[in-house]
C-alpha cells in the first residue's frame, strides 16, 4: 500500500472528512515521526510498533561488480520494531 491508497482508505472509512484533509493529517503525522527520528527520539505507537534510529558502524565493504574493497562510513538508519499486538495479529491472520 502506498500513501495515496492509505489516504483514500481512511477517507472512505470516514465520509465526514474530505480526502484533502485526510491527506494533510497523514502528511502531518509522517512529518512529526520524521522530525522525532531526526532528533534521535523514539516514536512508539502502542500496539503497532516503535520507530527509532540506530547507528551503523563504519566497515569495509566490497563492490559487487569489481570485487574491490570499499570503506563504508558510519551512518544512522531508521529501525522499526513491531508491537506485540501487531505480531499477534499477523500470526493469527486477523
Swiss-Prot record:
<dbReference type="GO" id="GO:0005829">
    <property type="term" value="C:cytosol"/>
</dbReference>
<keyword id="KW-0804">Transcription</keyword>
<protein>
    <recommendedName>
        <fullName>Integration host factor subunit beta</fullName>
    </recommendedName>
</protein>
<dbReference type="InterPro" id="IPR000119">
    <property type="entry name" value="Hist_DNA-bd"/>
</dbReference>
<dbReference type="InterPro" id="IPR005685">
    <property type="entry name" value="IHF_beta"/>
</dbReference>
<comment type="function">
    <text>This protein is one of the two subunits of integration host factor, a specific DNA-binding protein that functions in genetic recombination as well as in transcriptional and translational control.</text>
</comment>
<comment type="subunit">
    <text>Heterodimer of an alpha and a beta chain.</text>
</comment>
<comment type="similarity">
    <text>Belongs to the bacterial histone-like protein family.</text>
</comment>
<dbReference type="Pfam" id="PF00216">
    <property type="entry name" value="Bac_DNA_binding"/>
</dbReference>
<dbReference type="GO" id="GO:0006417">
    <property type="term" value="P:regulation of translation"/>
</dbReference>
<dbReference type="GO" id="GO:0030527">
    <property type="term" value="F:structural constituent of chromatin"/>
</dbReference>
<dbReference type="InterPro" id="IPR020816">
    <property type="entry name" value="Histone-like_DNA-bd_CS"/>
</dbReference>
<dbReference type="GO" id="GO:0003677">
    <property type="term" value="F:DNA binding"/>
</dbReference>
<dbReference type="GO" id="GO:0005694">
    <property type="term" value="C:chromosome"/>
</dbReference>
<keyword id="KW-0810">Translation regulation</keyword>
<dbReference type="InterPro" id="IPR010992">
    <property type="entry name" value="IHF-like_DNA-bd_dom_sf"/>
</dbReference>
<keyword id="KW-0233">DNA recombination</keyword>
<dbReference type="GO" id="GO:0006310">
    <property type="term" value="P:DNA recombination"/>
</dbReference>
<keyword id="KW-0805">Transcription regulation</keyword>
<keyword id="KW-0238">DNA-binding</keyword>
<dbReference type="GO" id="GO:0006355">
    <property type="term" value="P:regulation of DNA-templated transcription"/>
</dbReference>
